[in-house]
Amino acid sequence: MTQTFPKDFWEQAQTNIEFIATSYISGDIPFTAVKMLLFDDHKLLLTKVPRGWDIPTGHKEEGESIVETVKRETLEETGVTAKNVIFIGYLKLTQVVQNEQNKKYPPLSAIGVFICRDFTVSDFNKPLHEATERCFQEIDRIGEIHHYWPPIMESIMRYAYSKL
């Protein structure tokens, strides 16, 4: 049975979002960013960045693979070294209208989504990291502190947890 995921729409960026569950990293769509779902038992790693609590997320740098990006961003934001990361799919972003929020991105792009449960936690030194705090939050309580946890992300997290 194929799992279906809710769709989303980013109002400011005028962009439709849908999650494509796959283990294949396609070269047919440009990946511009990544998201990491890093689990420790029944808890998910969150990082406190200027917009609020979030999962480790970041943009791909020139010449970098998305696997390199997700490891780098996780380390930069949390001080956690992700070892064996697993690609579980991507958020497919389709611009409805080009505007100031989305003009630096292609009309069709992707955000790679990864999971990890093999990692090393180092000391968290705020000046060395992009975030001000990090925590492992019970997966049933993410919405209590996450700055924006829509149904699409809840369903992706549940799907990711089932893949461990």
Model-inferred region functions:
Residues M36, F87, F114-C116:
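A structural signal for short, well-ordered beta-strand segments
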Residues T81-L91:
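A short coil-to-beta-strand element that immediately follows conserved catalytic motifs
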Residues S155-L164:
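Charge-rich, low-complexity intrinsically disordered segments
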Residues L91-D123:
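Active-site-adjacent beta-strand/loop module that shapes the phosphate/pyrophosphate-binding cleft
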Residues M1-K35:
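Acidic, metal-coordinating catalytic segment for phosphate/diphosphate chemistry
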Residues G112-I115, F124-I156:
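NUDIX/MutT-family hydrolases
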Residues A33-K35, L44, A131:
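Short glycine-rich loop/turn motifs
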Residues F39-E77:
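Conserved Nudix-box catalytic region and its N-terminal flanking loop in Nudix hydrolases
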